[in-house]
């Protein structure tokens, strides 16, 4: 996967204004759950991924499943070339009263507006790929719109470029960007709301490290492997 080409392509994308409601803060939703002793799960929808995942059901079918469970928010892949995503999926999910994270390779602050227009409440920024000033501009534009930002890192060195503001969450994605394998060691990092991403499934959820405020879970929920049901049964969410 050529990440540079994805970022260049994303600079050419746009999306017209189609919001039908105000912002719902994903960060505040997770904090509220934490206050009641729960963790926040962000359920992710994607049609395919470079790691080999392919799903054959629609965003509507996915939403009808996850909205029956106690999730904190939705993460929707909108990148078209490698994930077969679309801003239109955000428009569809926007009818539900739940925070939506627009997950994409956000190249600049202008792209934040497109996520907002589609109905997103938060955007993803990958610290590994952007310089500090670009990250700052994205976070500030999101703040202007009332949106949250999930600053994601894969390599711990990328944390040097994090930009902290009151609308920021910090996420560690366990998937190595070079070989797409999972890192079993989870680094220590600070933040008001910390999110663990990738690799959570029914096979390991019983050993879930509960020191995080939230968890972004994709493939296992898409496969309906019982992870959500287990987390509810144990009172974690």
From Swiss-Prot:
InterPro entries: Aldolase_TIM, Indole-3-glycerol_P_synth, Indole-3-glycerol_P_synth_dom, Indole-3-GlycerolPSynthase_CS, RibuloseP-bd_barrel. NCBIfam families: PRK00278.2-1. The gene is trpC. Coiled coil: none annotated. It is an enzyme of class 4 (lyase). It comes from Thermoplasma volcanium (strain ATCC 51530 / DSM 4299 / JCM 9571 / NBRC 15438 / GSS1). Belongs to the TrpC family. One of its GO terms (biological process) is L-tryptophan biosynthetic process. SUPFAM superfamilies: Ribulose-phoshate binding barrel. This is Indole-3-glycerol phosphate synthase. Keywords: Amino-acid biosynthesis, Aromatic amino acid biosynthesis, Decarboxylase, Lyase, Tryptophan biosynthesis. Gene3D superfamilies: Aldolase class I (3.20.20.70). Its EC number is 4.1.1.48. It catalyses: 1-(2-carboxyphenylamino)-1-deoxy-D-ribulose 5-phosphate + H(+) = (1S,2R)-1-C-(indol-3-yl)glycerol 3-phosphate + CO2 + H2O.
């Amino acid at each position: 996967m050529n990440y540079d080409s994805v970022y260049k392509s994303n600079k050419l994308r746009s999306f017209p204004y189609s919001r039908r409601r105000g912002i719902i803060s994903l960060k505040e939703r997770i904090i509220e759950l934490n206050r009641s002793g729960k963790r926040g799960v962000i359920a992710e929808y994607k049609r395919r991924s470079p790691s080999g995942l392919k799903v054959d059901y629609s965003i509507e079918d996915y939403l009808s499943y996850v909205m029956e469970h106690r999730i904190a928010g939705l993460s929707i892949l909108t990148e078209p070339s490698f994930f077969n995503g679309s801003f239109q999926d955000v428009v569809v999910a926007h009818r539900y009263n739940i925070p939506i994270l627009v997950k994409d390779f956000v190249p600049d602050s202008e792209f934040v507006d497109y996520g907002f227009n589609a109905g997103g409440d938060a955007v993803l920024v990958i610290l590994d790929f952007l310089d500090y000033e670009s990250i700052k501009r994205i976070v500030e534009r999101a703040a202007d719109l009332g949106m949250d930002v999930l600053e994601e890192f894969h390599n711990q060195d990328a944390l040097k470029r994090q930009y902290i503001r009151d609308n920021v969450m910090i996420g560690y994605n366990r998937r190595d960007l070079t070989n797409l394998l999972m890192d079993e060691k989870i680094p220590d990092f600070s933040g008001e709301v910390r999110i663990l991403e990738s690799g959570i499934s029914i096979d390991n959820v019983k050993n879930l490290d509960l020191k995080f405020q939230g968890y972004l879970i994709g493939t296992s929920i898409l496969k309906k492997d019982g992870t959500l049901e287990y987390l509810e049964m144990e009172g974690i969410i």
